Amino acid sequence: MQEDLIIQKNLFAIGNDNNKQKEKTKIPEDLSLEDLKKESQKRPRQRKNSTNLINKFKTDLISNKKNVCINEESYSYKTVSKLKLTPVMKHYVTLKEENKDRLLLYRLGDFFECFFEDAVLISNLLEITLTSKDAGKEIGKIPMAGVPHHAMDRYCADLIKKNYSVVICDQLEKSSGNYGTPIKRGITRIITPGTVIEEGMLIAKKNNWITAIYLSEENSNESYEWGISKADVSTGELITLEGQSLSKLFDEIIKLDSSEIIVGSNAVRNLLIKGNSQITYTVSQETNFGINEANYLIKNYFQIANLEGIGLKNLKNATRSLGGLLNYLEKINPSNLDKDSSVKISLDFPQIQYGHNKLIIDYQTQKNLEIKNTQRENNYVGSLLWSIDRTYTCMGARCLRRWIDSPLLNVNEIYKRQNIITNFFESKKLRTDTQNLLRAMGDLERLAGRACAGHASPRDLIAIAEGLKKLPRLKSIIELFKYDLPNWTDQLINIDEGLLELADTISFKLVENPPLSISEGGMIHDGVDNILDGLRNLMDDYSEWLNKEELKERKISKISNLKIQFHKNFGYYISINKSKVNLAPQHWIKRQTLTNEERYITSEIKNKENKIFQIKSRASSKEYEIFCELRNIVAEKTKQIRSIAKSIASLDALLGLSITSIENNFIKPLLIPINDSMTKNSTKIIAGRNPIVEQLLSDKKFVANDISFEDNQKLIILTGPNASGKSCFIRQLGLIQILAQIGSFVPANNAEIKIADRIFTRIGAVDDQSSGQSTFMVEMSETASILNQATSNSLVLLDEIGRGTSTFDGLSIAWSVSEYLAKKIQCNTIFATHYHELNYLKNSNKNIQNFQVLVEQNDDQLIFSHRIVRGGSNKSYGIEAAKLAGVPKEVIEKAKSVLNSLEENNKLNHNIK
């Protein structure tokens, strides 16, 4: 209300002494709309152009300041003359020139400031005030915006989330107190979206990938060779792969889900943007992707004699991409900024990702099956991952996400995962004991990474120690497991004694609840260091002296409630109530007057204060030194900690899958290996259910359905009305296939599942405006990709083909595609369609079988049973579905009339050969 009143006063001069003058220009109330139109034509108003922040800054500066030099060069570090700048601004511009594509935060006193274009940008991004700073007599005012130094991490997190990289220039020494003496400043951190390790800048249950892409210089789209290397510097994971053709590269890039993608030139970036304009690429022209440089960097980083030992001997493009990634990380690594620093980015040996050892799920299939996010809203809730994730640690959640991205092909490895789920499934005590151990466990992968990078806090180290102390109890649980177990369980049974000793060392040196700040002391236990203990003894002596001094001054002044207190700005002082001022002795020196309090100092207190500060400073420095030594010890164990953390993560993921199985009545499937010549069995699922839809149906029971590809009947033609459940059914098979191949139990009463080498989906289609492709062309491109890449071991899920063209063209294409899949490729396929003519394919091809969604019609009312039964449907019930959707009755009646006419005059010949 107060704000409204102020606005009214300003606009209408309410309560203003000038009201009498305003009355002279009072607007007549009887003006008609025509009068106002004539007035506007008589004196037309000119449109005012909107101004950007820089122009607004100039306008405000000119209107509010006199004698200010306004030049275009004042607003850009690129055009400003360094010779005209103050020493501080000259240093800022020099650093900015070296970091053109990053925001530079420059420490000045208690603030980190930005200038020139960066100031305008961050004032907009962070919604902070844009102000100005004097850059020298000849330059005048320049734009400035800043954030408090204590809140810098929070603001950096906001910038990182908006995909900006940040350079931190901090003060490297304390102010000498001499005005005019420059303070030494330098770059202490470079933070990019792909290299953050701070907890507040990361998504706990998701990897934070930074990716480097090498692209060969070829002309043909299909002859382009490429290499990709991606790393999560917070967990140490490193994956590399290579391939051929731009189409495959574009698909891999979309699947990467990277926070930052590095390429070596604008030409490469421009080429990749054609594949997907929604992805941002960082062009690092100084990054070297040369093969010789890559060989040197990789061998030097991993301390190996050759590349053969890590599987890169014959993978030149993968090697180039990994070399480029390491080259980029080296340039932004803090250890390169400070040669004496012991910190580094620690990465594991690269995992070589081959197409032949994992189930391939391309981006389109991930999207269609809603594996990690829903298709329409891109939400986590409603995805496959949401439906099965019952993990207790962030490590386990990330592990499960990786498994879903790359399910296994090796049946023996899958069975070993199943065995752990079975152990948990059969024993509530094993589940409960493991849950209790994992529930409060910290993120050991990322905690170790922060220690290695020199950013771990005392609380981080305590969390590492607490996690490592649980290893013996985890060992006792694993030893109770039956059946054949994965190799990674060996680490949990044969525990590295060095890790247990490390946990004891951390607990011995650090207090249980250390402070957040590492510069103010209070984090190291007594008895850890003789020098620190000696300093603390002296501190105790001075504390005792202060207590005695307080009693002495009370006695002298006869003020019983007198206190000696401490303030960070004033130091130690005597505090008395204002009513006792008349009792203050003459040797007291007045320091500060407050509303109800007077503060004094004495020469004795001041003398002791200096000594107390010196001892406190030495003690804090000693604690910091001890802590840094301890952090370095932890950093040396980073690889061992991360290795055991990955085993814990796998255990957590399987524990979560066991809980999902119990909650949702999943069963253990029997798996049929690829190319199993001993059996002709194929996928057979009894009472299968869609794991996502079933959990979303809170008040309804999901209708389970069977499916079988036995007796070489590889292709199922599925017909039925719209909204009857066809799409749900074909997605259900894809989801069950993925669950089975990550080692999970599946939603069914019984299941035999043949291992698939790849899942293809063609479900729905929209036009692709970025590439200029129509809906039909997108549909045909996806179909062509399936026909050209599917093998007899693939799983193909089709939901309509040929809808975007004429009926005869569409039917012809659908017919031909079906025959090609059944006769030539012979892979397990479900084809949901409204072309009922395709049911006749069964008559001429023994590999094809017909199924339909059962529906009942009561007068004009459709009743969906969602039951899948053998046999083909001969009616789509499209008009009935339109009626259910609320289409006007007049339109429905007309549609019925047209349909009857078409059926009479355009009967199709079903004897197509």
From Swiss-Prot:
It comes from the Bacteria. Residues 19-42 have a biased composition (Basic and acidic residues). SUPFAM superfamilies: DNA repair protein MutS, domain I, DNA repair protein MutS, domain II, DNA repair protein MutS, domain III, P-loop containing nucleoside triphosphate hydrolases. Keywords: ATP-binding, DNA damage, DNA repair, DNA-binding, Nucleotide-binding. CDD domains: ABC_MutS1. ATP binds at G720, P721, N722, A723, S724, G725, K726, S727. This is DNA mismatch repair protein MutS. Residues 18-50 are annotated as: Disordered. It comes from Prochlorococcus marinus (strain MIT 9301). GO terms for cellular component: cytosol. GO terms for biological process: mismatch repair. Gene3D superfamilies: 1.10.1420.10, DNA repair protein MutS, domain I, MutS, connector domain, P-loop containing nucleotide triphosphate hydrolases. Belongs to the DNA mismatch repair MutS family. PANTHER family: DNA MISMATCH REPAIR PROTEIN MSH1, MITOCHONDRIAL, DNA MISMATCH REPAIR PROTEIN MUTS FAMILY MEMBER. GO terms for molecular function: ATP binding; ATP-dependent DNA damage sensor activity; damaged DNA binding; mismatched DNA binding. This protein is involved in the repair of mismatches in DNA. It is possible that it carries out the mismatch recognition step. This protein has a weak ATPase activity.
